[in-house]
Structure formats: C-alpha cells, structure tokens
Design a protein with these regions (language model features):
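Short acidic (Asp/Glu) and glycine-rich catalytic loops that position anionic groups and cofactors
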Residues: 135-136, 195-200, 233-235
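Short glycine/proline-rich, acidic loop/turn segments that cap or connect secondary-structure elements
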Residues: 187-196, 220-230
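Bacterial N-terminal signal peptides that target proteins for export
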Residues: 1-9
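Bacterial N-terminal signal peptides
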Residues: 10-18
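Primarily N-terminal secretory
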Residues: 1-2, 14, 22
Length: 262
C-alpha cells in the first residue's frame, strides 16, 4: 500500500495538531484511511479513532463508526457514475487519505470531504475509451490483489485481457467481498459455489460494484494496463509478489510449486 505504511497506522490514527489545550469544539483530530479498505473497514477505523480521541485526547467526537456506516449507506455516488441498473453503492468513491475533523464533525461532513478528494484525484486519471465505472471497479480489484506497486499495471492487464477473451476473472477477493469473508479465513467449497454476483469464478465480466476504495495509483493502473499478454498470476511464497504468465500450463506448474491447487 502506498502513501500509508501499515506499521505506522496505529501511531498516525489521531494527530495532535495543537500544542496547547483548547475547547473540545476546537480540537483538531486526524483520521487516516489506507488504500484498499471497504466502507465497512472505514467505519471500523472511525470507531478506533473515536476511542483514541476519547481516551488520549479526552474529547468525545460526534462522529461514530455507526453514523459513518449509516451516512455511507444513504450517500449517492457522484452523478457521472450513476448506474442505469439503479445500484447506488458508494463503495469505491470514499477516497483513502488523511482527513482532519473536529469534535462536532458529522459523518456526512467527513464523507463529503472524501468525495471531494475523490473528484479531485479522479480528474488526474486519463480514461481513454474505457468506461469510468469499469475503471473504478478494476482499480478496486487491483488494490486488493497486490501489495507490490510495480505489479499494479500487470494485474490490470490480466483483468482486461481476460475480459477481452470472455474468460471468468476468478478473483477470490471479489467473492470474499460479496460473502463478507475475511482474508484470514480460507474459502470453502461451498463459498466457491455461492451464486453471489461477486463470484467471478461463476460469473463472467466485472463484479457489480467496486470491492474497495482505491487510491490514485491503482486508478491509473486500471486505466493504463501494461502491454502484455498475461492471463494468469499466482502469489509467490513471500505473500507480496506474483508470478505472471500467459500460459495456463505454466500457471498450474507454478501454483503447484507454491503449494496451491490449480
């Protein structure tokens, strides 16, 4: 993840921006949302920050995890991304970054900041002929699929190449999102047969919505994939990098070598 190092998150959740004591309404707090988090995970982050503010700063913010989740559920996506099928998920639009807020800041106000930042960052993405929402969905998958910045455009290429050939994407992260299965719990045979539209083993094409809130590098990678013919990738034993190939046979060989089933 770029921009925010995971090991620094705990220390950076709440930043003291004023050197002297001030009335609660004037206290400045900071929340950092890392790239690739879901709305639910962002709501959990809000709850964590609130507890730190209460116990370390002796301030009780109006903002809560529950109010953030509720506001996100009723917030409309930007007009340019409204869908003909009436889906209104805000997932993908809550831009990951650091945000300042005060004790009286509401969830709707924080979300408005995130949407404003999304708009500013999105304008930096040159879409070419690709559909904006498709690019955002692909960016969210890139964010969840690789931790290595140099692999973003390669993962993007695999996704677009498989779509062009009418191949199922077969991305576990989409199924986990659809079923709410955490990353530390193995997918079961029952999970893999689930008919959720987020099951990209069973359903061709993109999932219905983004599966996370991506940062700018993943958005740019989604819009500009690497010019390679790769169709497969498998995670290496370091759990960070992947082996990429255009050959199913080579993919299966590497998968077996790394201890996975093909």
């Amino acid at each position: 993840v770029t921009g925010v190092q995971r090991g620094l998150l705990a220390a950076a959740l709440v930043a003291l921006l004023a050197a002297t004591a001030a009335p609660a309404a004037d206290v400045s707090l900071k929340i950092i949302f890392p790239e690739g988090r879901t709305v639910r995970q962002m709501a959990d982050r809000v709850s964590q920050v609130r507890q730190i503010a209460i116990h370390k700063r002796h301030v009780t913010p109006v903002l809560t995890g529950a109010s953030y989740a509720a506001a996100a559920a009723t917030t409309e996506p930007p007009a340019a991304f409204r869908r003909a099928d009436t889906r209104k998920s805000i997932e993908g639009f809550l831009f990951p970054a650091g945000y300042l807020f005060g004790a009286s800041t509401t969830a709707s106000e924080l979300i408005a900041q995130q949407l404003q930042t999304f708009g500013a960052e999105w304008r930096k993405v040159e879409l070419g002929t690709r559909k904006p929402y498709d690019v955002l969905v692909v960016a969210s998958m890139i964010e969840r699929e690789t931790k290595a910045p140099e692999e973003r455009k390669l993962v993007s290429a695999v996704i677009w190449n498989r779509l062009a050939k009418g191949m199922p994407l077969g991305i576990d992260a989409t199924l986990r999102y659809g079923l709410g299965v955490p990353g530390n719990r193995p997918l079961t045979a029952k999970d893999l047969r689930d008919p959720t539209p987020y099951n990209t083993d069973l359903n061709k094409g993109l999932p219905p919505t983004p599966i996370a809130n991506p940062g700018l590098p993943s958005m740019q990678a989604a819009a500009h994939p690497a010019k390679v013919d790769y169709l497969y990738y498998v995670r290496k034993p370091d759990h960070v990098h992947h082996f990429f190939t255009a050959s199913e046979q080579e993919f299966c060989q590497k998968a077996a070598e790394y201890g996975y089933h093909c």
